[in-house]
Regions:
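A charged, amphipathic alpha-helical module
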Residues: 153-155
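Cys/His-rich zinc-coordinating "finger/knuckle" motifs
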Residues: 30
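Extracellular/periplasmic Venus flytrap/periplasmic-binding protein
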Residues: 157-172
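PLD/PLD-like phosphodiesterase catalytic module centered on the HKD motif
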Residues: 1-17, 36-104, 109-151, 163-164, ...
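Active-site metal-binding motif and surrounding structural segment of the metallo-beta-lactamase
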Residues: 27
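An anion/phosphate-binding loop that grips the pyrophosphate of nucleotide cofactors and donors
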Residues: 23, 174
Length: 337
């Protein structure tokens, strides 16, 4: 099977650990957050048995917070080559791995305990030679701070290169159904394509994070995007039990995109991201099954003014949110005073 699927937390970290344990020659890792002790020990063990390991880490979050310091110290102590990600990009949010130049992992998950045990996440593995070579080519280019140009006919989707165009085309090609799982729905081009899909009769199921989890500077775009899609007939829910971290789209139960790309301008324009498109039946079938199960374990997001105010109270930001979003309930309250 050229493509296969790992579902988190259902499958646990075992498929990733087993793959690294099977590495014989080379291991290339690119990660936004790498703090999980099991994954770290597995990589250190690979180095100890003679595997050539290279690791590229994002040095810091947008706010300057660095999470990967202890991991970097441990890797370098084991004589593993570690580079910061390419400073050409605001962040390297890509999560991926290539083993023995034969198998590539395209992931939504960080290598941290939470993403491996508590969040809905996915990884697609590929053994297509041209896809693996392209992943290696990008890794080598970013490692050396050189220009990388994606292959036009590839199933790989890269940001900031062709991500927005490829995701827009994927949505445009849907005929009957679209199932989306993503943290952010903020990019106006993607929102426009989803609106057009709804208007041509595509049934759209959107799983999103609740509004109170959005950062203040993303609140207008995030809530606005969800409201626009709801108003044209898309169903908008939030997952119960698990935290949603996945970035996944399934079209017509025949094709899917999985990777690190949030549907936001920053992801498309300023960050190194990677996703993969697949039509492998066993992969798309399982993604569809998980999407349906998650939908059955979700609840509708109340996008009315009252519903948004109630949700925003969960972070003590109802007043700020009401003011920014021009919510009617807030306006009426001000008149009374």
């Amino acid at each position: 099977m050229s493509h296969s699927l790992v579902v988190l937390p259902d499958d646990s970290a075992k498929p990733l650990v087993d793959a690294i344990n099977a590495a014989k020659r080379t291991l290339q890792i690119r990660m936004f957050l790498f703090t999980d002790p099991t994954m770290l020990q597995t990589v250190l063990a690979a180095k100890k048995r003679g595997v050539h390991v290279r690791v590229m880490l994002n040095p810091a979050r947008r706010d300057g917070t660095s999470d990967n310091g202890e991991t970097r110290v441990a890797l370098e102590a084991a004589k593993i080559e570690v580079h910061d990600s390419n400073p050409e990009f605001a962040l390297t949010h890509q999560k991926s791995m290539v083993i023995d130049e034969k198998t590539g992992f395209v992931e939504s998950l960080n290598w941290e305990i939470r993403d491996l045990t508590e969040t809905r996440d996915y990884a697609v593995t590929t053994e297509h030679g041209h896809e693996v070579k392209e992943m290696i080519a990008c890794f080598d280019a970013d490692w050396a701070r050189q220009k990388f140009v994606p292959r036009g006919e590839s199933q790989l989707i890269w940001c900031p290169d062709n991500g927005r165009e490829r995701i827009a085309e994927f949505i445009e090609s849907a005929k009957h159904t679209l199932w989306l799982q993503n943290e952010r729905y903020q990019d106006t081009v993607i929102i426009e394509r989803l609106v057009r899909a709804a208007r041509r009769g595509v049934k759209i199921h959107i799983l999103a994070r609740p509004p109170h989890t959005l950062k203040k500077d993303k609140l207008i775009e995030g809530v606005g995007g969800l409201r626009i899609m709801h108003d044209v007939g898309a169903k908008v829910h939030t997952l119960k039990g698990l935290k949603l971290h996945a970035k996944m789209i399934v079209a017509d139960h025949k094709r899917a995109v999985v990777g690190s790309i949030n549907l936001a301008p920053g992801s498309f324009d300023a960050r190194r991201e990677l996703a993969i498109e697949t039509d492998a039946h066993h992969v798309v079938s399982r993604l569809s099954e998980v999407a349906q199960r998650d939908w059955d374990n979700s609840k509708k997001i109340d996008l009315t003014d009252e519903g948004l105010l109630k949700d925003l109270e969960k972070r003590n930001a109802a007043a700020v949110g009401a003011e920014m979003l021009v919510l009617k309930t807030h306006a009426k309250a001000k008149v009374k005073h």
